[in-house]
């Protein structure tokens, strides 16, 4: 039995964020994008934005523990092109939890 668990842990797919590019946002207009975590074998314990690579002012990422998705929503306040890092991890079971991260560029226009 232990051998089967070890084989499964070693061969399971790595989770990844299904959204590869964020759509263009507009100042003063509501914005919402669902970010799914693909290939997660367990629930997602956290999905966050790195403080060093934040979302534009007015946008935030929300996530409920165990959900395999998060949502970026809000209303952007300033134009620009922003580098954003979204990262997270899955819960562990017999196998250790797995990490996921994705760099994005988000453009905010008038």
Question: Where are each of the predicted segments found?
Answer:
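Solvent-exposed, low-complexity, repeat-rich "mucin-like" stalks and linkers
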Residues: 1-8, 15-46, 104-109
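An extracellular/luminal cadherin ectodomain-centered signature
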Residues: 13, 45-50, 72-74
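Beta-strand-rich interaction surfaces with strong enrichment in secreted/lumenal proteins
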Residues: 21-23, 60-62, 73
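Low-complexity "stalk/linker" and mucin-like segments enriched in Ser/Thr/Pro/Ala/Gly
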Residues: 52-70
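Well-ordered beta-strand positions in beta-sheet-rich domains
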Residues: 71, 101-105
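Extracellular/luminal low-complexity segments enriched in Ser/Thr/Pro
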Residues: 71-81
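Short, solvent-exposed loop/turn segments at the edges of extracellular beta-sandwich modules
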Residues: 90-96
């Amino acid at each position: 039995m232990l051998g089967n668990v070890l084989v499964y842990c070693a061969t399971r797919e790595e989770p990844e964020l299904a959204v590869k590019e964020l759509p263009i946002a507009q100042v003063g207009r509501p914005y919402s994008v669902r970010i799914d975590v693909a290939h997660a074998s367990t629930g997602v314990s956290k999905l966050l934005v790195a403080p060093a690579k934040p979302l534009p002012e007015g946008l935030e990422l929300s996530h409920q523990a165990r959900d395999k998705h998060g949502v970026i929503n809000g209303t952007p306040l300033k134009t620009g092109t922003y580098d954003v890092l979204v990262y997270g991890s899955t819960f562990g079971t017999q196998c250790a939890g797995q990490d996921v991260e994705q760099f994005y560029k988000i453009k905010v226009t008038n």
